[in-house]
Amino acid sequence: MRKNFSTILIVGAALLLASCVQQKESFSPVDYVNPLMGTESTYAFSHGNTYPAVAVPWGMNFWSPQTGENGSGWMYTYTDSLIRGFRQTHQPSPWINDYGTFSIMPLSGVLKMDHKERGVPFSHTQEEAAPYSYSVTFADGLRTELSATSRGAVFEVTFPQDSAQYI
């Protein structure tokens, strides 16, 4: 009887110990970075003068959602409600002009070529930003995800069914 009790006690203790051990979630320091911090800037007052850059360390370029018009130094402003494209940039700050820049904008439905008209409504609740990736689902159901490479970017676009699709 004593041997059975000892066996049951050892097995019970092992089960209790196993249930207490939790798997540690692996976080990298980069997972604590919020690229949207500092993006609520205006011409009158700066709250950071940043944009949500997606890049790799020492990469040749950055990628960012673009809420401002082409030619505007204010590429992304948190208070805007339209995304006009996803911009390849070399711009380190809104105070320094950019060069060699272009935008890519996936659209569904009606094709709009004018950058002033092609903005698509979005909500920050449908936006995910990290230093290594950005994704947004637009009000029309179109979803765009991007990740940077050392010399470019990889896009994944999910279009709504039964609508015209453009990039």
Task: Label every PLM stretch briefly.
Residues 1-9:
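Bacterial N-terminal signal peptides that target proteins for export
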